[in-house]
Design a protein with these regions (language model features):
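Membrane-helix entry/capping segments
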Residues: 1-7, 12, 16, 52, ...
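Generic structural signal for small/hydrophobic residues in well-ordered secondary structure
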Residues: 14-17, 24, 45, 61, ...
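Small-residue-rich transmembrane alpha-helices
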Residues: 33, 37, 325-390, 432, ...
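Short, strongly hydrophobic transmembrane alpha-helices
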Residues: 17-44, 409-433, 444, 666, ...
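Intracellular coupling helices
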Residues: 5-23, 27, 286-327, 389-400, ...
Length: 774
C-alpha cells in the first residue's frame, strides 16, 4: 500500500512538472543509450583473440618486424618439435580462384604449416585437424566461404583451382572466426609453396614474409622455453634482437613494420570512449539532481504537510529514492528503444550494432547492476536529502536557498560546462586532423583510378590487355604494379650502397606507372619504352632514400638491391605517401619489370565512370575470361587505412552532441531553479519599471560567467590532451586559436539558448502573478 501510494505521488508529480520530467527522462535515456553503445563497442573490441584455447602459451616471434624468414620456423619445427610447437603463415591477397569453372576472387588467403591446428586448437566442423594441412594442395574453408563457393552441397573433397593452374582439395570446414587479428576464411597448406613458387622456398634464410607463432610447453617455465628458442636462433647466425609477443597482446599492440595482414585495435581510442561515457553519465546525473531540485520549489508544501502528518525523514528519503528509481527505469526502457531504432544508423556510423546477446553475460550483468546501483545513489541521495530537509513552514522555502546548496549546484553545472567545452574543442581538433589526413597532398593523384587484380598466369596477356583498354576514349592511361597505394607494401628489403646495407620498400612497375599515378619526377629520367632491354638494371629512388642514405649526386650511382641485380639510379621521384599519413616517409625504390605484377592501374575519364567500367569489363572478359572481374577504386582503397579513425570520428561527434545537449539541459535546470527563487524580486523590479532586456541581463549574466569560467579551465585541458593525441600521427595538423574561439562561440550560443527560454518567460510574466500572495 505504501509503495503504491508513493507511485501515485510519483505519477502525479510527473504530470504536474511534465516538461521538466520529460527532459529528465529523455536526458537520462540519451546518456544511458550512449553509455550502452560505448559499452557494446568496447565489448566487441575486447572479443579479439579471445576463446583461443591455451592462448596464454602462444606467442608471435618478432624482431623489428612482425614476420620472420621461412628458415626460422623450419629449424624450430625440426629441432624442437614435440617440445615447442610453431607454425608459419604466409598471406596471399586478392587470389583468383575457380570452382566448377566459375571464377571468384578471394580477398585474403592464408597458407599455414601442418602444425597450425596444434598451435591453434580450433575444431573443424568437417575434416580431421591433424591431417587437414598435412599434404600439399590441401585447403580449409570457413563456413561462410564454403556456402559462398559450394552452396548447400558438401564441399569436402571438392576441387578449388588457384590462378587457373593449381588444384587444391577441400580437406576441412571450420567455423567463421571474425575476431582474430588475422583472417582464417581460407587456409591452405604451406607446403604447396614448394611447387607454387620454387623448391626450397620454405627453407630460405632471407625473406621476412612469414609471421611465426609459437606455443610453449605447459610443463616447462616459459622463460626456459623462450631461451631455448633464442639459443637455437643465435646458432643460425641471425643478429636481430628477437622477442616473444604474447598472442593476447597483439591486437592492442602498436603496429610494427612488415606485420602482414594483422588487424589492430586502439587501446587509446577505447580509453577515450570510456572516459567520454563516464563523463556523459556524470553529466546526466548532475542534470537529474539540478532539475529535481529545481522542481522542489513546487513541492515544499507537500513535504511540509507530510511532516505535519508525522512522516519521518527516512520515509521521505525512501519516497524520493523510489521516484529516482522510477525515472531511471523509465529512462533505461526508452534508452533500449533508442538503441533499437538507431541500430542501422549505428552500423553505418561505427561499423557495429548493439546485440542483446553480446551484452548479456554473467560479468556484464554484474557490472551493469553495480553501475546502476551507484548511479541511483549518485542521482537520488542528494535530491532526497535536500527535499526532506524542508522545514514545516509551508509558505516559504527556508533551506532550499542556502548558500551551500547554491554553491554545490553552481559547481556541478560549471563541471558540466567544462566537460562540454573540452569535448567541443577536442572534437574540432580531431575533425581538423582527420580532414587534414583526407585532403593532404599525397604526392600522387588517387582519384579516378580503377584497380584490377592480376596474377602470374595473366602475364602473357598484359600487353594485349593494355592495348585493348587504350582503344577506348573513356580510358586515359593504364599501368601495372606489384603493389597499390594504401595496401600492404611487404617487408623491408636491403640495398647495398658503397658496402653499407640500407633498408627500403619497393614496388615493381611498368614504364607508364609515374604518368598514370601522377607521381612527379624531381631529377633525372623515368623508365622509357625506348630502352626496354636496359630497364631491368635501372632504378628510381625517392627523396627520403637520398636523405637517409646520404647520397651525393645520386643520378648514375650504382647500387645492389635485394633482387640481386646491380643497377644504376636513373631518376629521383618526389616523395609520395604510398601509405597513409599515420606513417612517416620511408626509402622507396621503383623497379621496372614485366613480371611480379599484381595490379592493373587504370585512369578513367571522371565524367564517364559508369561507361568506363563497362568498357573495362568488356575487355577483361575478352582477354581474361577465366578470372573473375572485380574492381576497386584507389581512393576508396586508400581511405580504408583510416577506417578506425573515421569510426572514432563519427562516435566522437555523436557523443559530443549528446554531452552538449545534456550540459544544455543542466543550464536549463539551474536557470529554472534560479528564476523560480527570484520570482518575487523579478516582480518588484518590473513594477519599478525594469525593462525586459534588463531582466534578461540580470538572469543570464551569471550563467554566461559560468560558461566563461568553463572556457578558462577547458582550453588548456583540451590543448594538452590533443597535443598528446596528435603525437600518434607522423603528419599532423596545427592547433589554431580559431578552434578555441569557435568552441567559445558555440558554447556561448548553446548556453544562451538553454537559459533564454526560462529567462524570457520570467521577464515577460505579469508582475501581478509574482506578487499575488506576498
Amino acid at each position: 500500500m505504501l509503495f503504491g501510494g508513493i507511485l501515485n505521488i510519483t505519477f502525479r508529480n510527473f504530470r504536474k512538472n511534465l516538461i521538466s520530467s520529460l527532459i529528465k527522462v529523455f536526458g537520462l535515456a540519451l546518456s544511458i543509450s550512449a553509455v550502452i553503445v560505448i559499452w557494446a563497442y568496447i565489448i566487441n573490441e575486447n572479443k579479439y583473440d579471445k576463446n583461443v584455447p591455451d592462448s596464454e602459451r602462444i606467442y608471435r616471434l618478432d624482431a623489428q618486424w612482425g614476420s620472420m624468414p621461412a628458415f626460422l620456423g623450419h629449424i624450430i619445427n625440426q629441432s624442437l618439435y614435440g617440445h615447442v610447437l610453431s607454425t608459419r603463415l604466409n598471406f596471399l591477397t586478392d587470389a583468383g580462384i575457380q570452382v566448377n569453372n566459375i571464377p571468384y576472387n578471394l580477398k585474403e588467403m592464408v597458407f599455414a604449416d601442418s602444425t597450425f591446428f596444434k598451435v591453434f586448437k580450433f575444431n573443424l566442423i568437417e575434416g580431421d585437424p591433424r591431417e587437414a594441412l598435412a599434404r600439399p594442395f590441401s585447403i580449409i574453408l570457413s563456413e561462410s566461404n564454403a556456402k559462398r563457393l559450394f552452396g548447400d552441397s558438401d564441399p569436402l573433397g571438392k576441387i578449388i583451382r588457384l590462378e587457373n593452374q593449381y588444384d587444391f582439395t577441400v580437406t576441412g570446414i571450420m567455423k567463421d572466426r571474425p575476431y582474430l587479428h588475422f583472417k582464417t576464411g581460407v587456409i591452405a597448406s604451406l607446403s604447396s609453396m614448394e611447387q607454387i613458387r620454387y623448391k626450397g622456398v620454405l627453407k630460405e634464410y632471407d625473406g621476412w614474409m612469414y609471421p611465426t607463432y609459437i606455443m610453449l610447453p605447459e610443463d616447462v617455465p616459459a622463460e626456459i622455453s623462450k631461451k631455448e628458442v633464442l639459443d637455437l636462433i643465435k646458432k643460425s647466425e641471425y643478429t636481430e634482437d628477437f622477442n616473444f609477443k604474447p598472442f593476447n597482446d597483439i591486437y592492442y599492440s602498436p603496429e610494427i613494420e612488415n606485420e602482414s595482414n594483422t588487424k589492430h585495435g586502439s587501446i587509446l581510442y577505447n580509453k577515450i570512449l570510456i572516459s567520454i561515457s563516464i563523463f556523459i553519465l556524470l553529466l546526466a546525473a548532475i542534470n537529474f539532481v539540478n532539475l529535481t531540485i529545481a522542481d522542489s520549489i513546487s513541492r515544499s508544501k507537500e513535504v511540509s504537510m507530510k511532516k505535519i502528518q508525522g512522516a519521518s525523514k527516512i520515509h521521505l528519503v525512501s519516497q524520493f529514492m523510489i521516484e529516482t528509481i522510477f525515472y531511471i527505469i523509465s529512462s533505461l526502457i526508452i534508452a533500449f528503444f533508442i538503441i533499437w531504432f538507431f541500430n542501422p544508423v549505428l552500423y553505418s556510423v561505427a561499423g557495429m550494432s548493439v546485440q542483446a546477446g553480446n551484452l548479456i553475460s554473467g560479468n556484464n550483468i554484474i557490472t551493469g547492476t553495480i553501475a546502476l546501483f551507484i548511479f541511483v545513489l549518485l542521482t537520488g541521495m542528494y535530491p532526497a536529502y535536500h527535499l526532506s530537509a524542508y522545514t514545516i513552514n509551508s509558505s516559504k522555502i527556508i533551506s532550499a536557498g542556502r548558500s551551500s546548496h547554491v554553491r554545490i549546484r553552481n559547481g556541478l553545472v560549471l563541471f558540466q560546462n567544462i566537460v562540454a567545452v573540452t569535448l567541443i574543442c577536442c572534437t574540432l581538433i580531431a575533425f581538423k586532423q582527420f580532414n587534414y589526413m583526407r585532403k593532404a597532398d599525397l604526392g600522387f593523384n588517387k582519384r579516378d583510378i580503377v584497380n584490377l587484380n592480376i596474377n602470374s598466369q595473366m602475364e602473357d596477356h598484359l600487353d594485349l590487355l593494355k592495348e585493348r583498354l587504350m582503344k577506348y576514349p573513356t580510358i586515359e592511361n593504364v599501368s601495372y604494379s606489384s603493389r597499390i597505394m594504401g595496401s600492404y607494401w611487404g617487408s623491408w628489403c636491403c640495398v647495398n650502397i658503397e658496402g653499407k646495407e640500407n633498408k627500403y620498400f619497393n614496388n615493381y612497375v611498368d614504364a607508364d606507372y609515374l604518368e598514370t599515378m601522377g607521381i612527379k619526377l624531381k631529377e633525372g629520367k623515368s623508365f622509357s619504352r625506348e630502352n626496354l632491354s636496359e630497364l631491368k638494371t635501372t632504378y628510381l629512388i625517392n627523396e627520403t632514400a637520398i636523405k637517409q642514405y646520404n647520397l651525393k649526386d645520386p643520378i648514375g650511382h650504382v647500387i645492389l638491391p635485394g633482387n640481386g641485380i646491380k643497377g644504376t639510379i636513373i631518376g629521383i621521384i618526389k616523395d609520395f605517401h604510398y601509405r597513409g599519413l599515420n606513417y612517416a616517409q620511408t626509402p622507396l625504390l621503383l623497379f621496372y619489370t614485366d613480371n611480379h605484377l599484381r595490379y592493373v592501374n587504370i585512369r578513367i575519364d571522371p565524367a564517364k565512370t559508369a561507361e568506363s567500367l563497362k568498357d573495362i569489363k568488356t575487355v577483361w572478359d575478352e582477354v581474361c575470361p577465366a578470372f573473375a572481374f572485380e574492381y576497386s577504386f584507389l581512393d576508396q582503397t586508400y581511405d580504408l587505412q583510416y577506417k578506425s579513425e573515421k569510426r572514432f570520428e563519427n562516435l566522437l561527434f555523436v557523443f559530443t552532441i549528446i554531452a552538449i545537449f545534456i550540459a544544455g539541459i543542466g543550464l536549463f535546470g539551474l536557470s529554472t531553479f534560479s528564476t523560480g527563487q527570484r520570482t518575487k524580486e523579478i516582480g518588484i523590479r518590473r513594477v519599478n519599471g525594469a525593462r525586459e532586456y534588463e531582466i534578461l541581463k540580470l538572469l543570464n549574466k551569471n550563467f554566461l560567467k559560468m560558461v566563461v569560467m568553463a572556457f578558462i579551465v577547458a582550453f588548456p585541458l583540451s590543448w594538452y590532451a590533443m597535443q598528446k593525441w596528435l603525437m600518434n600521427f607522423a603528419y599532423r595538423t596545427d592547433i589554431n586559436i580559431w578552434i578555441f574561439m569557435l568552441s567559445a562561440i558555440l558554447a556561448l550560443i548553446i548556453a544562451f539558448i538553454s537559459v533564454s527560454w526560462t529567462s524570457w518567460r520570467a521577464a515577460t510574466r505579469n508582475p501581478v502573478e509574482a506578487l499575488r500572495y506576498e
